[in-house]
Amino acid sequence: MQYILEKAKLELIKILSPYIPESDIEIRNPPENIKADFAVPLFGFAKKQKLNPINLTEELLKKVKLEDTIFSQIEAKGGFLNFTFNPVKFSQAVFRNFQELEEKYGSSEEGKAKTIVIDYSSPNIAKPFSVGHLRSTIIGHALCNIFSFMGYTVIGDNHIGDWGTQFGKLMFEFNNSGDKNVIDANPIEELLKLYVKFHEEAKKNPSLEEHGRAWFKKLENGDPEATELWKWFSQISWKEFQRIYDMLDVKFDEVLGESFYNDKLQDIIKEAFDKGLATWGEALPDEVESADGITKQREQSESKKEIVALIRLDDYGISTPLLIQKSDGASLYATRDLATAKDRINRRRPVEIIYVVGGEQQLYFKQWFKVMELMGYKETKFSHVWFGLVRLPEGRMKTREGRVIFLEDVLNEAINRAKICIQDRNLNDREKEEISKIVGIGAVKYADLSQNRIKDIVFDWDKALNMHGDSGPYLQYAYARIQSILRKSGQDINFNLGVCRIQK
């Protein structure tokens, strides 16, 4: 199926080919100050023929005929031939495309036989699914839909954060003060309380951090008690996450999590050393913990350097080395991301892997993308689609301090506000429930996607749940009204009519 613009370009080539070789015909979009639809520069052809381009355009203007074409006007200006569509013929052709393709209008085969992996959402097990996670989830899901529409085989991968030092902290605190029955009744909120409590106690007694690291090391070594706790944390967390994904109508092609790649970590570290990229060096404790996703201020007296495996990138304009292994052999974020990327390449052979992750990690992605290139993985393109943070009026959300807004609370509030808007409608209870979910959650999605992607957002309940003006519900209402008008007309719409005859 060819769209009208493609057909129009072919028709323009046919019009000009008696006078200009096809290889010399270049079709451009004209600049904004030129009121035309296509512009054809003649400088290159004129130079070959040793002609003045202005004179050449004037000469062609006399020869080119537009009868029985989709074009209504031709203009010679500054070495360009500018062509304008016949508005009636063009509109009729567009609407014929609509009728022929219906909901597939706008799709293409650009991605035929090509695979793209999109890594998005990726919440952490045992932590709340906050409004901050909405951005990655909704942007990533939109990208999946767009690339699928373009003909790509899309693998939407929810790379769950189910590994890392935070699990050691939770295990320690659960054994110290947790209650399984209480947690089973309200998993995420109760696990959050344990996480916050651990950090509150660690401020008073920093040695607790070592207990957390020791528990995680037990997990990495396959300790039965640690493994059983980790499986339980993962199962109850995913059950909570799935309920939110169902509300958002977001589905994934793959949900493996960081832990899936544990048996591949040593291979990627060995490969980095074998290829002469990795060396042993020193890093401050803060730098090591930052590389494991932990941000913590230490006293100066604590800042004794640790031995780590790292990859220096100074020769490539990146002054911060990428840390890939702790001195005790424990893995870091980068270790797991490198192993994951290699596995995705081997299993999927994607042309591109896209990571939908916040802008605060731009440096980190530059680091390990460069490492993948240096290790020889050049056939796959790596892209970081980053976005601004969602902040609270009092500052950045902080899980360890319990300063978060649960996404489920936002979605439920949106549904309730939508119910109020439609309570006087002549609908039964089931219809009201269904419509309020569609409208409420649509409002939240639209409010996020309509923002400037790269700017930080200060969370505002009224803006997030807007039901009027420039909002999701407004667009949904407009669509419903148009469908109603078409149904009530009782006529088949014939787009061969003289549409666009009003030209004033």
Please identify what each model-predicted range represents:
Residues M1-I27:
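Charged, compositionally biased N-terminal leader segments and the immediate start
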Residues Q2-K7, K47-P53:
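Short, surface-exposed ligand-recognition loops at beta-strand->loop->(often short) alpha-helix junctions
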Residues E22-G44, N52-K504:
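NTP-dependent nucleotidyl-transfer catalytic core
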